[in-house]
Amino acid sequence: MKNLLSMEALTVHEIEHLLEQAAQFKRGKKATFNEQTFAVNMFFEPSTRTHTSFEVAEKKLGVEVVSFDAASSSMTKGETLYDTLLTMQAVGVNVAVIRHSEENYYAGLEKLDIAIVNGGDGCGEHPSQSLLDLFTIKEQFGTFQGLKVAIAGDIRHSRVANSNMKVLKRLGAELFFSGPREWFDESYLAYGTYLSVDEIVEKVDVLMLLRVQHERHSGTDEFTKESYHEKFGLTENRAKQLKEDAIIMHPSPVNRDVEIADSLVESEKSRIVTQMTNGVFIRMAILEAILKEQEMRAKLCTY
């Protein structure tokens, strides 16, 4: 695997391999790269979980993390992302994890030798989040085949939803959507069925809630926090309708008492904190796959 840019670029076999490697890391597997392996985390949008867990993953693998601050870089002088990455490549950085506000920012960057991991591109995709979600689901159920999974909330503006709806259908899950119709595109019906939140809670195995992404909305919000929670959120009463073995997920950050009642965030059915923990292990697996391929290519070039 040279880069990780989208879930669609991964085969089912590659996905299964990454999930298995993440499971091995969680069980205590060790993998250390030499001290001349470098990573840079380039985040042009705010991030807590993705940024932190990638850095922890890098350090657990023995990878040196190169500091980068967009606000103090030459990009403020007009340097392009391509030329910035060309610089990173020239000084010996092996892999760049990039979070960017523009969808498909990575177009044209694939020809560089430095590996690129998409840490989220606008409303486009978030492949490492999708993989950690898959890892969390597989840990719980052991399979995706036949699982009923609901994606509920601000779907149109969610890169997580874009990644997950495509891959979950490919892996054999049955998908449902819920949330405001204003934030739902009819094209999503190619992947699943739209139902009200009251209809989905009693039938799904996995309820995947999405944050209301105020920063990507134009104009005045159509819902107050209270009205959104009442109409579309997972209230305490709705949670009582969930199946006994159903789980609750959320990519975070969570708007408590908006998408989900505050009391449910750390409840028995919630896997929200587990997702954060699993993020380190899946990102270790991603980095290991990329860096091992780089090592193999380097060895071939010496013959």
From Swiss-Prot:
NCBIfam families: asp_carb_tr, PRK00856.1. Heterododecamer (2C3:3R2) of six catalytic PyrB chains organized as two trimers (C3), and six regulatory PyrI chains organized as three dimers (R2). Its EC number is 2.1.3.2. PROSITE patterns: CARBAMOYLTRANSFERASE. One of its GO terms (molecular function) is aspartate carbamoyltransferase activity. It holds the Pfam family OTCace. Carbamoyl phosphate binds at residues 49-50, 99, 126, 129, 252-253. GO terms for cellular component: cytosol. One of its GO terms (biological process) is 'de novo' pyrimidine nucleobase biosynthetic process. L-aspartate binds at residues 77, 159, 211. It is an enzyme of class 2 (transferase). This is Aspartate carbamoyltransferase catalytic subunit. Pathway: Pyrimidine metabolism; UMP biosynthesis via de novo pathway; (S)-dihydroorotate from bicarbonate: step 2/3. It catalyses: carbamoyl phosphate + L-aspartate = N-carbamoyl-L-aspartate + phosphate + H(+). InterPro entries: Asp/Orn_carbamoyltranf_P-bd (IPR006132), Asp/Orn_carbamoylTrfase (IPR006130), Asp/Orn_carbamoylTrfase_sf (IPR036901), Asp_carbamoyltransf (IPR002082), Asp_carbamoyltransf_Asp/Orn-bd (IPR006131). Belongs to the aspartate/ornithine carbamoyltransferase superfamily. ATCase family. Catalyzes the condensation of carbamoyl phosphate and aspartate to form carbamoyl aspartate and inorganic phosphate, the committed step in the de novo pyrimidine nucleotide biosynthesis pathway. Keywords: Pyrimidine biosynthesis, Transferase.
